[in-house]
Amino acid sequence: MLNSIRMPKWIAILLISSSSTLASVSLIRPMITYRALELGASPAQIGVLGAVYALFPIVLALFLGKNVGRFGEAKYIVFGASTMFLLAIGFSFINSLFLLMLATAAIGISHLIGVIGGQTMISTRSPNEKLDGFFGYYAFGASLGQMIGPLVGGIVAGSDGVLPKSTSMGFLAAAGFALIALLPTFYWRNQKIAIQQSVNQSGTFTAAVSMLKKPGMGKAIYISLAISSAVDVLIVFLPLFGTENNFSPFAVGVILAIRAGTSMFSRIFLGAIAQKLGSHFLMLISIIASTIFCAAMFFARTPIALGIAVAIAGLALGVGQPLTMSLVSRLAPPEDRALAISARLTANRVGQFVVPASAGAIAGAAGAGSVFLGLAALLASSIFTAL
């Protein structure tokens, strides 16, 4: 398959590593929700846990992006996978909400570092005409991991009514995926930095604000915030929605895997489709479809109905994410692309901090299903940005 779509070797290696990393984090996060429920967490506390995942990345993303040129993209990826392996093992021993919150914050930083490394590698090593396609491959790998992780988690953790038999087994399986993510990175052990990133004497924050003033950059980053927040909230709140509607953890794992699978399918030939239809038009259609089917989830009260709505939403969300990656990269000169990627990720994490916390409050008052209506409203607001 890799040869048939003419994937460069470095992209193939990055795909293997990133898909394994995403399998790990996509397994860990639902297990965090289930572990919190085992410890008696309320819907509001579940929302706080989801928000804490993004809290420190909000502060660190710009700084980390500004320093990619000093350490190299490959080292970021290796560090992210290594710390994720150690944290996944640590999660299996946690039996307090406070420690669970601290570990959740740490896994958010670990994942961020790896993502900055991977996305910067693509943005600096790819010709402009290949950005849509190469980011599509990268996002394909992410979806593959997001599909495999919850499936394996549902099988390994087992089912005891609406909760897993063993969340610890789920966390240990996540550690295994993180270890797999490390193996292909030995190929990069002697790799040189692709492009030395620019040094802005006015400071990282000032440089980022200046970049946001570039025509189209602010709009692209807001769309990215809306899409990433929607995906993040689905991962965190589908387990809670499942417990409210008597879905087994395995059923929830399958539904999460379906979302990732349809996203993965939409990304295989993204480059060719974007060239034919145009990136802007394709992004607009994907946001509209995401809005409609996130709202449809509110009315789904069986695993099959929810699975159908999630599948179509996943297909649409899967298109939007990589298109915002390539758009942000195109709007920045090569020497500033790491900072542009980090500005986008900062916005994503702001959304992933604010939206889950708000969703937790909504779920506590009106049930987890109402969260999906909130996501639809957020996505709808980005439609006007894309026009």
List where the protein language model places each region:
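Structural signature of the two symmetry-related core transmembrane helices
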Residues: 75-89, 281-295
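Helix-loop boundary and gating motifs at the non-cytosolic
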Residues: 8-54, 219, 223, 228-241, ...
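C-terminal membrane-cytosol helix-exit motif in multi-pass small-molecule transporters
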Residues: 175-196, 385-387
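Cytoplasmic helix-loop-helix junction between adjacent transmembrane helices
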Residues: 105-142, 327
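Juxtamembrane intracellular "pre-TM" segments in multi-pass secondary transporters
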Residues: 1-8, 190-221
